[in-house]
């Protein structure tokens, strides 16, 4: 599956469902990170944001930043020049952290989306996340 226009629309629509407003955003982010840490228990990458406690104010602030970034990237999936600039910014920023498990995080996010949305198009998520976001952010 490619990240074509239909897949981008599905991803944007499903993101709007799962990451709607207010407290549900935090709840979704906590679900994603709890699922991620179950299969990727090494939290050393998150030491400076109190990664041992996903409920701490420091880690909640980190989650807000991470998911705000996803929100930006997903909102511009269909605007290639803006998407490319946003990805270049995030790629430059993340270089300071060394190797980041973007693929594993994506798999966890897909699983969590499927838990929150019946009939989620995980193929579209995999394609757009792998082809656009991971490829761009690791460039």
From Swiss-Prot:
Residues 2-139 form the Globin domain. Heme b binds at residue 94. Keywords: Disulfide bond, Heme, Iron, Metal-binding, Oxygen transport, Secreted, Transport. Disulfide bonds join 3-128. GO terms for molecular function: heme binding; iron ion binding; oxygen binding; oxygen carrier activity. Pfam families: Globin. The keyword Heme applies. GO terms for cellular component: extracellular region; hemoglobin complex. It is found in: Secreted. Belongs to the globin family. The giant hemoglobins of worms are formed of a monomeric subunit and a disulfide-bonded trimer. This subunit is monomeric. This is Extracellular globin-1. It comes from Tylorrhynchus heterochetus (Japanese palolo worm).
């Amino acid at each position: 599956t490619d990240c074509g226009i239909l897949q981008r629309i599905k991803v944007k629509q499903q993101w709007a469902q799962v990451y709607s407003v207010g407290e549900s955003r935090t709840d979704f982010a906590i679900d994603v990170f709890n699922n991620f840490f179950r299969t990727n228990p090494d939290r050393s990458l998150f030491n400076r944001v109190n990664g041992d406690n996903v409920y701490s104010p420091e880690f909640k602030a980190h989650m807000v930043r991470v998911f705000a970034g996803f929100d930006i990237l997903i909102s511009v999936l269909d605007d290639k020049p803006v998407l490319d600039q946003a990805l270049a910014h995030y790629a430059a920023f993340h270089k300071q952290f060394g190797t980041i498990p973007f693929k594993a995080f994506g798999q966890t996010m897909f699983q969590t989306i499927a838990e929150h949305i019946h009939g989620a198009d995980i193929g579209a998520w995999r394609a757009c996340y792998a082809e656009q976001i991971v490829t761009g952010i690791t460039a």
